[in-house]
């Protein structure tokens, strides 16, 4: 698995190094058009290298997303983020992404949420979302899970789930959760999602 990570990091580092070089060119007076043209070449090379990487390793992204190593999960999320593989019908992967969107570490939550939102996978897989939400409610929650779930519902612009979440929280006798309920309620009142 170390080779897998090292090879991906080489591809990623090459992208970052070349992108920095292009930014430096632009800042040193090279025309915008030339800088954009150069950056497009860099991105094309990056996507080509990622495709070769995927063909070489043929990774099972669902398995990688469930790995205990957060580095491996991050690489899997970045491979999905790049959008080079159509995963829109992979229900297991969608379940894992939804779970990571709520219960993952900060970086995982952000990446998984952006993937789900940008690809429109939540609309197509609403039953999966509702099943995961009900499972999480059944397991009970603390301040952090309540906060992360509320933020997730806000980020996906699902006011119905956010309002239902607030109602569920009202049954819990916890001052910190009550503060979150007030914050989420103010968000709903202050703007329409």
What spans do the regions from the language model cover?
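Eukaryotic acidic, Ser/Thr-rich intrinsically disordered low-complexity regions
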Residues: 2-12, 16, 160-193
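Structural detector for internal amphipathic alpha-helices that build alpha-solenoid repeat scaffolds
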Residues: 28-52, 74-87, 110-122, 144-156, ...
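Amphipathic alpha-helical scaffolding segments comprising HEAT/armadillo-like alpha-solenoid repeats
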Residues: 52-64, 87-100, 123-136, 159-169, ...
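Alpha-helix N-cap/helix-start positions at coil->helix boundaries
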Residues: 70-71, 102-107, 139-144, 174-178
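Helix-adjacent hinge/juxtasegments
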Residues: 90-119
């Amino acid at each position: 698995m170390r080779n897998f990570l090292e090879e991906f990091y080489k591809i990623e580092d090459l992208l970052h190094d070349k992108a920095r070089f292009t930014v430096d060119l632009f800042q040193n007076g090279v025309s915008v058009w030339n800088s954009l043209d150069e950056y497009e070449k860099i991105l094309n090379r990056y996507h080509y290298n990622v495709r070769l990487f995927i063909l070489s390793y043929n990774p099972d992204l669902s398995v990688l997303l469930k790995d205990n190593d957060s580095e491996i999960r991050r690489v899997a999320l970045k491979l999905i983020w790049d959008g080079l593989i159509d995963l829109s019908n992979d229900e297991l992967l969608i379940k894992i992404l939804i779970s990571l969107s709520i219960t993952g570490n900060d970086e995982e939550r952000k990446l998984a949420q952006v993937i789900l939102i940008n690809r429109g996978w939540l609309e197509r897989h609403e039953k999966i979302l509702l099943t995961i939400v009900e499972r999480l409610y059944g397991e009970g929650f603390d301040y952090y899970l309540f906060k992360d779930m509320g933020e997730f519902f806000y980020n996906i612009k699902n006011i119905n789930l956010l309002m239902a979440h607030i109602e569920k929280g009202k049954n819990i006798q916890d001052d910190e959760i009550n503060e979150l309920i007030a914050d989420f309620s103010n968000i709903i009142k202050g703007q329409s999602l």
